Amino acid sequence: MKAYLEAQEVALMEKATINLRDRLLVRLLFHLGCRVSEALALTVEDVDLGRSTITIKHLKARLKLSCINCGQRLGRSHVFCPKCGGRVEKAQTEQQERHRQRVLPVDGDTLSMLKDYIRRGGPVVRDGKRLIFGINRHRAWQIIRGCAEKAGLPKLVNPETGTIHNVSPHRLRDAFAVHAVKLDDSGDGLRLLQEHLGHASFDTTAKYRKVAGEELKNWYARLWNKKVRSDEQKSDGH
C-alpha cells in the first residue's frame, strides 16, 4: 500500500472536481504545499499577481511576541513591557509578526486559475476580508476525500505508524514535499523545502527523505519477489 500520492494522482483529483473552487483548493494544497488552515485563511490581498507570489500566514502555532530589550513575553494588548517598563512600539510588533509569514512563488498555471477564480467572483467576503474559499475545515476535508474517491485513488498508509487512512488535505502537502525531495534531496534542497513548508525544525522536513526512500525499497522487494517466483517456476519445471 502506498504512503503518499504521486503528482499524476493529484491531477486525477483535479479532474474529479465539480467546480472551479474545489479544483483550486486541490491545486493550491499541492502546488503550495500549504496546510489546510493556511489555505482557508488566504485572502485576495494575499495574492500578488504582479510578482506571482502568495503570502501564507503561519497559523499552526500561536504568535509569540517578546520585548527586544529584555526578552519578556508580551501580549498583543501590552503597551509597556511588564518587566523592564519599556514602551512596546507598533513597528517592533509588526516586525516580529512578519517572521510568522512566508511568501511563496506560484507557477503560471496555478496563477491563471486563481485569476479566473477571482474574476468570476469566487472569493467570499466575511468580517471585512475577501476570503479565497470561504469554507470551513470540515468542508475542505469532505471535498478532498470526495475527489480522491471519485478519482479511484486508494487509501494511504502512514509510514511511521502503519495506520491506514483516507486521502486528506494534509496528504497533498505530503505529496508536494515528497515530490520536491525526489527532485532534490541535497542539504540545500531540504533547507529550501523547510523554508517553503514553514517547518520550525529541520528534522520535520528531513522525514520526507525517508518517505521518498520507500520507493526504492518497494522496487527492490518487487525485483526479488519476481526473481524468486521465476526460480520457483524453473524448479517446478525440472
Annotate each PLM feature.
Residues L197-R222:
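Catalytic-site neighborhood detector that most strongly recognizes the C-terminal catalytic loop/helix
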Residues V10, R21-R23, R137, W141, ...:
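Short, leucine-enriched amphipathic alpha-helices that occur as contiguous helical runs
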Residues L29, L40, Q194, A206:
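The alpha-helix within a helix-turn-helix
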Residues A175, A221-K227:
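Short, basic, alpha-helical segments at the C-terminal edge of helix-turn-helix-like DNA-binding modules
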Residues G122-G128, Q142-E195:
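Short, basic (Lys/Arg/His-rich) helix/loop patches that form interaction surfaces
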Residues A3, A7-L32, V36, V125, ...:
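Basic, Lys/Arg- and aromatic-enriched nucleic-acid-binding interface segment
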Residues A41-D116:
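Conserved tyrosine-mediated DNA breakage-rejoining catalytic core shared by Y-recombinases
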Residues S77-Q95, D109-E149, L156-E160:
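Major-groove DNA-contacting interfaces characterized by cationic-aromatic clusters
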